[in-house]
Amino acid sequence: MRLVILETSDSVGKWAAKYVMKRINDFQPSADRYFVLGLPTGSTPLGMYKELIEFHKQGKVSFQYVKTFNMDEYVGLARDHHESYHYFMWNNFFKHIDIEPKNVHILDGNAADLVAECNKFEDQIREAGGVELFIGGIGPDGHIAFNEPGSSLVSRTRVKTLAQDTLEANARFFDNDMSKVPKQALTVGVGTVMDSKEVMILITGAHKAFALYKAIEEGVNHMWTVSAFQQHANTLMICDEDATLELRVKTVKYFKGILRDLDEGSPLEGYKN
């Protein structure tokens, strides 16, 4: 596992975008060999998406031969609902780049058979050759996608009933009306993300500091699902200073020292865990 500690949340978005651009360009995707990218929603990756859009406009990266798989989607929200993840991804990223719509994969929360939809999503990932780089964010309780505390660490894409804490946290997006908050979601499993060749997790803000501590300094625990990625061969966590507040000083110095040796701010050329 590698931890990259940067000054601000803006720095995290810029660094992550540079890394994604480098991974795509180094891969040299083509019509016969697509780069497969796993993507999250939420406020944390917005800065990364904005930077990638700029890189695309500048001609530094193309998404023509990129296939994407998103982590999750609410059950029962129309695709054009302003809180659906379809809407989020198209509005904040896809419509601004040169990706082919057929290469975008987002779970359908309105499918007639939700279990079949989840199984199809797993099949599509396999048919694409697996995910090259899966990007995620985490919640204050250490959840990734909708794999909330207590989720199986070998789980696959499935229907999840959302915890009360999640419903209450999401109410602010639905006029603070709990009756409007979707009670279920479709989500990739922890095992689904673990199958990817590389995982990059973005963590910003003091409110996620304890989750980062659990992910880095304590053992693997299904009550903190992000901790599972200690056992992935290529996990890269990118965080800001605020997110390190619960880490030991020795831990922070250790990872900062590695980054300094690799030229701080660069997209970790040739990094190895």
From Swiss-Prot:
Subcellular location: Cytoplasm
Primary localisation category: cytoplasm
Domain of life: Eukaryota
Similarity comment text for this entry: Belongs to the glucosamine/galactosamine-6-phosphate isomerase family.
Active site: 72 (proton acceptor), 141 (for ring-opening step), 143 (proton acceptor), 148 (for ring-opening step)
Pfam families from the UniProt entry: Glucosamine_iso
Physiological role: Catalyzes the reversible conversion of alpha-D-glucosamine 6-phosphate (GlcN-6P) into beta-D-fructose 6-phosphate (Fru-6P) and ammonium ion, a regulatory reaction step in de novo uridine diphosphate-N-acetyl-alpha-D-glucosamine (UDP-GlcNAc) biosynthesis via hexosamine pathway.
BP GO annotations: carbohydrate metabolic process; generation of precursor metabolites and energy; glucosamine catabolic process; N-acetylglucosamine catabolic process; N-acetylglucosamine metabolic process; N-acetylneuraminate catabolic process; UDP-N-acetylglucosamine biosynthetic process
Known catalytic reactions: alpha-D-glucosamine 6-phosphate + H2O = beta-D-fructose 6-phosphate + NH4(+)
EC number(s) reported in the record: 3.5.99.6
Protein's UniProt keywords contain Cytoplasm: yes
Protein name: Glucosamine-6-phosphate deaminase
Swiss-Prot/TrEMBL keywords: Carbohydrate metabolism, Cytoplasm, Hydrolase
InterPro entries: Glc/Gal-6P_isomerase, Glucosamine6P_isomerase, Glucosamine6P_isomerase_CS, NagB/RpiA_transferase-like
GO MF terms, alphabetically ordered: glucosamine-6-phosphate deaminase activity; identical protein binding
SUPFAM superfamilies associated with the record: NagB/RpiA/CoA transferase-like
